[in-house]
Amino acid sequence: MARRLKFSILASIFSLSLFILPSSSFADWTPLIERLTADNFDEQVIREIFDRPGVNFDPSAMSCKLKELINKRYKKQDTISASKVRAAYARFLKPEVIAAAQTYLQKNRETLQGITDAYCVPKEIVVSILLVETELGRHLGDRGAFNTLASMALSSDLETIRPYLAPDLVTRRSEEFARKRCRQKADWAYGELKALIRYASENGIDPLSIPGSLYGAIGICQFMPTKISVYGVDADRDGRVNLFAEPDALYSMANYLRSHGWRCDMSAKRQYRVILAYNHSKIYADTVLTVAKKLKE
């Protein structure tokens, strides 16, 4: 989805293109704990979570996001060129990858047909998005979603994250913009963190066990946590929305597309626009449609 830039391809490219971040694991989580408590989370439960050794401050997500936003705003030359991103996506078009997606489609044909009947989203589109998002559910992210979102939420002050930025990234010209966007993204992450904690509690999941993408998207369909209560579907009717189980994740994906304008017998142009609502990258949308076309052949 749109916040993921947030998916594994760009995450891996970012990690290669950024300077080496100083390691950091210690943080004073008190402001975040107090904020969550003020928002009616159980203080004891929240403190117990943050006291666990698995909770570490990770500056990489906010660092990447600020770099992305500043470069876009001030049109700086970025090391991540469109050609590199397109080359990364091109691997989804390899014959062996398409063959694996075709096998997945056949194996899950009954579930996928149910999705098409309910939402008019072709099974090839569902499988194509799943392939690009998580390689058919095999790669769910290489970091904990809780640490990512908590670290971003704690980084509302630019000075918290400045030591982990390239020295020449924030200039006198861009500093006010950087401070504003840092606050905005921290507030956004805080909302996602609250949703993640609720999701974990409602589903009996250890919040620290949930893997996530660069910016905290979770599940085989890669939803940001706030989207689960809006678009999540309990397809297997077990009383919970489990985005790590195929029926729920795939139906939720289709429900998201339907809610953003997907209709039966849409033109390719309109399909493209709806897919952009799932992820704002044009290369992403191009790849999804190309893979879907190949799956029909």
Locations of regions flagged by a protein language model:
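Cell-wall glycan-active module
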Residues: 1-216, 220-221, 226-297
